[in-house]
Curated annotation (Swiss-Prot):
PANTHER family: PYRUVATE, PHOSPHATE DIKINASE REGULATORY PROTEIN 1, CHLOROPLASTIC
GO function terms (MF aspect): ADP binding; ATP binding; phosphotransferase activity, phosphate group as acceptor; protein serine/threonine kinase activity
Source organism of the structure: Bacillus cereus (strain B4264)
Enzyme Commission no: 2.7.11.32, 2.7.4.27
The protein's name in its UniProt record: Putative pyruvate, phosphate dikinase regulatory protein
The keyword Nucleotide-binding is annotated on this UniProt entry: yes
Domain of life: Bacteria
Reactions performed catalytically: N(tele)-phospho-L-histidyl/L-threonyl-[pyruvate, phosphate dikinase] + ADP = N(tele)-phospho-L-histidyl/O-phospho-L-threonyl-[pyruvate, phosphate dikinase] + AMP + H(+); N(tele)-phospho-L-histidyl/O-phospho-L-threonyl-[pyruvate, phosphate dikinase] + phosphate + H(+) = N(tele)-phospho-L-histidyl/L-threonyl-[pyruvate, phosphate dikinase] + diphosphate
Keywords, alphabetical: Kinase, Nucleotide-binding, Serine/threonine-protein kinase, Transferase
């Protein structure tokens, strides 16, 4: 039984069937010769695989989501005396029976979900790497650039957009004593969003922040005159960039995120 040939047939990449076959074969003392046949779209290919499998006395294991293709392979393989094992079909049928929902019958759904997952991870890592202006090079690489003074929800908003919308977001804090990075004036203004907040609201938020850290709320950080100075600087920078401004004074992060996503979609940037 050494090098028993198994043809793995799929209407997508065939990774699912390959993994299942290897897991099953791992229970036996012989090494399987697994030959993958991916992206099968027609019965002609199935007929050819059956013929080859017959000549090699091989087993066919398959993941085909379309019922007509599954039935063709099972029927024709039986006629030729070839063993064909349906890995995913019975489970799809069982789930349909239990839930009453009709399957989509779309090949490659798992792979597309995997791709979406990795896009999300990439976006999250990007948000962490380019958070709080720690590397200005991220500004030119980002899908979205958030600009604002301290405590305008730049970081949580960046993470929300990464987690839920898979957008790569860089955020830039503005303080009067530090010139904004040059990249801020080089990036397309359509990618930039200024986060505006009223002085009173920011004063309250900063005082609460200081209290949570066990510090006096009388620090310069929460001083209303200092706050106004920062907001004036913010407005000066934003006027040069000429980007969209969102008042986040009384908005939840989800609401601000939706405004940004809608703006991006309207601009047809992606």
């Amino acid at each position: 039984m050494d090098n028993k040939i198994v043809y793995v047939v799929s209407d997508s990449v065939g990774e699912t069937a390959d993994l299942v076959v290897r897991a099953a074969m791992g229970q036996f003392p012989f090494a399987p010769d697994i030959r993958r046949v991916p992206y099968v779209e027609d019965t002609g290919t199935l007929k050819e695989v059956i013929s080859i499998a017959k000549s090699n006395q091989a087993l066919i294991c398959f993941t085909l989501v379309k019922p007509d293709m599954r039935q063709y392979l099972v029927t024709e393989a039986a006629k030729e005396g070839v063993e064909a094992y349906d890995i995913i079909g019975p489970l799809i049928d069982q789930i349909e029976e239990i839930t009453g929902q009709v399957p989509r019958y779309e090949p490659g759904v798992v792979r597309r979900l995997d791709e979406e997952y990795f896009k999300k991870i990439e976006a999250i890592e990007f948000a962490v790497k380019y958070d709080d202006g720690r590397d200005a090079r991220g500004i030119l690489k980002a899908d979205i650039v958030l600009i604002g003074v301290s405590r305008t929800s730049k970081t949580p908003l960046s993470q929300y957009l990464a987690h839920n919308k898979r957008l790569k977001v860089a955020n830039v804090p503005l303080v009067p004593e530090v010139d904004p990075p040059e990249e801020l004036y080089q990036v397309a203004k359509e990618k930039c969003f200024g986060l505006k907040i009223t002085p009173d609201k920011l004063n309250h938020i900063r005082k609460e922040r200081l209290k949570s850290l066990g510090l006096s709320d009388g620090a310069t950080y929460a001083n209303i005159n200092r706050i106004q100075e920062e907001i004036d600087h913010f407005e000066e920078v934003i006027s040069k960039i000429n980007c969209q401004v969102i008042d986040v004074s009384n908005k939840a992060i989800e609401e601000t995120a939706n405004i940004i996503v809608n703006a991006v979609q309207n601009q047809k940037m992606f």
